[in-house]
Structure formats: C-alpha cells, structure tokens
Curated annotation (Swiss-Prot):
EC number, UniProt record: 5.4.3.8
SUPFAM superfamilies: PLP-dependent transferases (SSF53383)
A GO BP annotation: protoporphyrinogen IX biosynthetic process
Localization of this protein: Cytoplasm
Quaternary assembly: Homodimer.
Gene Ontology CC terms: cytoplasm
Reactions that this protein is recorded to catalyse: (S)-4-amino-5-oxopentanoate = 5-aminolevulinate
Positions of post-translational N6-(pyridoxal phosphate)lysine modification: 268
Name used for this protein in its record: Glutamate-1-semialdehyde 2,1-aminomutase 2
Recorded GO MF terms: glutamate-1-semialdehyde 2,1-aminomutase activity; pyridoxal phosphate binding; transaminase activity
C-alpha cells in the first residue's frame, strides 16, 4: 500500500497540531510509531484514505458508529437539522423527543440531562453523587477509562486501603486522594475498600462491561454485589455506558445484565457520530442539579439541534428487529475463524468477545482484569496491527482497544478479514 499522501499530511500536522493528533489514541506511538493513516471518507463498513486505499473498518470511531459510516437516515437527519440552524441556545422539541426515547429504552433514567461528551457526563455524575451524599470519595476500577477530567485520571494505590495517585501530570495529589482504585471483578478488594472508607464514599464508578482495556465481562454476581455493598454503606452506583449503551443491547448493558444503577453516564455512542453526552438516573438524585437544586452544570452546546436529531435517527435505525442478532452472528463468525487460525498457527493469543465487539490479546491467559491486559504482548500486537493495516484492515492502534462490528459489515467482510488475519499470523 502507498501512504505517501498520509505521510505528507501528517508532516504538516506535526508542524501545526500538538503531537500531530487531536487525541493521543490516534497516534501510532503504541504500535511502533510512524505516520497515522489519514482518512478521506467513510462509507458503510469502509474507510478510504487520502491515497485512495480502502479499508474494512473495525475502529468505528472507538465504538459509536454502530450503523456504519454515513448511514443515509442519520445523514439526512443532520442535513435537515443544519438547514434550520445548527445552534439555538434555547429549548427545542427534538431534545424532548430524544430524552423520551432514551427513557423508553433505559428505565433507570427517571430524569436525563444532555451534555457534550462522555467526559463531561462522567464528571457531572461524580459531582451529583457527592452533592447527594455529602461525601467526597469515589471508587473506580483499575484500567477503566472514564474521560480526562482530573478525578478519573488516578492510578491505584498499593491496595484497597491506600488512596490513589495521579495518573497524569497536572492532576493534584489532593484530587487523587479522593479516589480509591480496585481491580475489576475482585469483589473482596471492593469490600475491603468500603471497610476502610465506607462512610466517606459518595459513589462507585463502573463500566458494567469493560470496553477500555478490551472487552471484559463482569463475573457472575459481581455487579449485583457492587450494588449491594455500595448501597449498604449509603453510596451511589454510577454506570459509565459511554461505550456499552446500545452497543450490546437496545437498553444498554444494564438492561442486558439486569442490574440497575443509580446514575448512568452516556457519550459518543448515543449521538450517531456527533459530539454528545448525557447523564441521568433516579429522580430524587437528579433533582439536586440546577435549576432545581444546588449542583451546578450547564453548557451552551448541550442539547444542540444537530446532535439531538442525529441521536433520534440513530435510535430509529438500531431499534429495528434483528440488529443485535446480526452483530452477534458476525461477531461469532469472526471469533470462531480467528480461534481456528490461532490454533492452526500456534499463536499465543486469546479472544474476548461479546456480540459485535471483541479484543484479541496476545497472551495464553484469559483476560479478566486490567493487570492481565497490561501483561499481554504489546510487541506482538504492534506487528499484527501493521500487518493488518497493510492488507486494508483498520484497527485501533492499541492492544487495549476493541474491534467493533457494525450493521454495515457483511459476511464477505468477515471472510476477507480472516484472510488478512491468516496472512498476518503466517508472518508472526
């Protein structure tokens, strides 16, 4: 494949944009460096770069493009919205319609509020939980990414009795001291954290299905135990469904798993590809937010006409019967084929999959927590990534990220992907 135009544009980007990218996850630093491929357009399950190369896309903008790129129903909705003005700063009927659709899909949303990103949604749920409980500390799980606000950029201490440390320059130690980080799927360490700090903990922030160190499901009974322990100590449970909402089930991970949180944060996945976030939950908790309560949150772009109408159009598409069965069918086909190739070529790898999302980990061990994900072979993944890229398969440039299948993918796409996987394994 020729990447000369991508390389030339990236050289310009390096001169004009910090680090050459507008999000570190787009850099190829984690896969051995080099200029990231610059895309020109997306259509269905495919990307086309500035050199004219075509890719089967499994990045899907890190998950939200469930319908595939440039889905006509969503595109037309955005065009209609833009023709009537892109930003009002006033209420619109579309934000009411979209809120009602979210409430219908996810019953825990007794009240909902729109914001502009998943980071903003999570940040606000933490503020609301603190206001409601009158407490300051938060529990999060190791390796789970919840955006880039200070309170969630915190690494684990040496154990559940130890408070966190900053995971980024610029995060004050005083902020990190309000966060306890414990391993996902380890209910005993979770209980120990409450033993030490139970009357200080405002809320527990959890991805009900992990999507940020690959796809990792909770152990049976884990989320139920999280609810029980948190509520017995007067703490709230906050679900981060920025990745999981509408990806595995129309009602979100909480509906699929049958566990109800107190608050939920949403992000990119609900917006059909446009910037968006939302949070919601129990009415008595949400009424602590302005203008009804003393907890302040606002945003000029919140509930803007473009994002609202794109979100409505997205839900209209994916609510159709068979959406999730189709994603599961293609996911199973891809997983089965890859496992056969792993065995055929004696590749040291494991796959975690849930419906239309999966991760390949280069390790002999099944990954169930962040420590295990961190220990996987990053060099092997980097080689695999480059080999797949040169065969027209677009993946996230990180061993921690998932592959996302869309309703635009076909069985032929899966077969073509498996051919590329086999060619890659032959060279590893």
């Amino acid at each position: 494949m020729n990447f000369s135009n991508s390389e030339a544009i990236q050289n310009r980007a390096n001169a004009a944009i910090l680090g050459g990218v507008n999000s570190p996850s787009r850099s190829y630093k984690a896969v051995g460096g080099g200029a990231p491929v610059v895309m020109a357009r997306g259509e269905g399950a495919y990307f086309y770069d500035v050199d004219g190369n075509k890719y089967i896309d499994y990045l899907a903008a890190y998950g939200p493009i469930i319908t595939g790129h440039a889905h006509p129903h969503i595109t037309e909705a955005i065009k209609r919205a833009a023709e009537n003005g892109v930003l009002y700063g006033t209420p619109t009927e579309h934000e009411v319609v979209f809120a009602e659709m979210l409430q219908e899909a996810i019953p825990s949303l007794e009240k909902v509020r729109f914001v502009n990103s998943g980071t903003e949604a999570v940040m606000t749920t933490i503020r609301v939980a603190r206001a409601y409980t009158g407490r300051d500390k938060i529990i999060k799980f190791a390796g789970c990414y919840h955006g880039h606000s200070d309170l969630v950029l915190v690494a684990a201490g040496s154990g559940p009795s130890q408070l966190g440390t900053p995971d980024s320059a610029g995060v004050p130690k005083s902020v990190a001291q309000e966060v306890i980080t414990v391993p996902f799927n380890d209910i005993e360490q979770f209980k120990e954290a409450f033993y030490h700090f139970g009357d200080q903990i405002a809320g527990v922030l959890v991805e009900p299905i992990v999507g940020n160190f690959g796809i990792v499901e909770p152990h049976a009974g884990f989320l139920e135990a999280v609810n029980e322990v948190a509520h017995s100590h007067g703490a709230l449970v906050i679900y981060d469904e920025v990745i999981t909402a509408f990806r595995f089930c129309y009602g979100g991970a909480q509906d699929m798993l049958g566990v109800k949180p107190d608050l939920t944060a949403f992000g990119k996945v609900i917006g059909g590809g446009l910037p968006i976030g939302a949070y919601g939950g129990r009415q008595d908790i949400m009424e602590h937010v302005a203008p009804l309560g003393p907890t302040y949150q606002a945003g000029t772009m919140a509930g803007n006409p473009l994002s609202m109408q794109a979100g409505i159009a997205l839900l209209e598409v994916i609510k159709a019967e068979g959406t999730y069965d189709y994603l599961d069918k293609l996911g199973e086909m891809l997983e089965t084929g890859m496992n056969e190739l792993i065995e055929k070529y004696s590749i040291k790898a494991n796959i975690n999959r849930l419906k239309g999302a999966m991760t390949i980990y280069f390790t002999d061990e099944k990954v169930e927590n962040y420590e295990q994900a961190e220990a996987t072979d990053g060099e092997a993944f980097a080689k695999f990534f480059k080999l797949m890229l040169h065969q027209g398969i677009n993946l996230a440039p990180s061993k921690y990220e998932a592959w996302f299948i869309t309703i635009a993918h076909t069985e032929q796409d899966i077969q073509d992907t498996l051919i590329a996987v086999e060619n890659s394994f032959k060279q590893m």
